[in-house]
Amino acid sequence: MKAIVPFKVVNVKSRLASLLTPEERSELAKLMLRDITSTLAAAGVEVELLTTQPFEWDGATVIVSEKELNPALNDYLLANDSPVMIVMADIPLITEKNVRDMLASPADIVICPGRGGGTNVQLIRRPDKYHVDYYGASFMDHMRIAQENGLTTEVFDSFNVSSDIDEAGDLIELYIHGKGDAAKYLRSITVLDDSKGRVRVVKEESNLRAVRIPGKMTG
């Protein structure tokens, strides 16, 4: 089984700019990618990365394409005649068990939705009869595409896999629930604050009341 992980090399996670510096965003993105690729490899999945410019990554083949995301991924599907996974690079809570549970499904298409109508992971057993359409309400689009092509589907319901890190408000899930290097790094540069009622991730220097989690991992 192969998995393709799209990864943006430059100007990564710009929607986290309200909290993190460009250097911090870049480091966090790389650590999330490391957590994800390590998890996939532990589940016996061969990892390939899809990027728009060359870079090196241990343990994965890097595929460079100048095309936009959808055309690049659809070219990839056309070039494969065996099952493949498409995994987004911002779901660092995904576990080996999550991956193995998806692989155990007999459905032609296994889809794990993201929050807000997106699609975080797809397992595609018939890439010759399927194409992707990311952005917008892509979960509904992918369910429709599968139905139109006569493919069976399973919606994989998982907190871990649905928790994508796009905006500053999403970081709370990684901070509290993360066990990998991305979470450790986030905890080293931020703290939790509940001075406004709902807990959120802030910078240490903020003049706010920090919340310490019992047993919180550091480092």
UniProtKB/Swiss-Prot annotation:
Recite the UniProt keywords alphabetically: GTP-binding, Nucleotide-binding, Nucleotidyltransferase, Transferase
Q: Say if the entry is tagged with keyword NADP.
A: no
What does the record give under GO molecular function? Answer: GTP binding; phospholactate guanylyltransferase activity
- Cited InterPro entries: CofC, Nucleotide-diphossugar_trans
Superkingdom of the organism of origin: Archaea
Protein family membership: Belongs to the CofC family.
Cross-referenced HAMAP family: CofC
What is the protein's name according to its record?
2-phospho-L-lactate guanylyltransferase
| Organism field | Methanocella arvoryzae (strain DSM 22066 / NBRC 105507 / MRE50)
Task: Tell me the gene name.
Answer: cofC
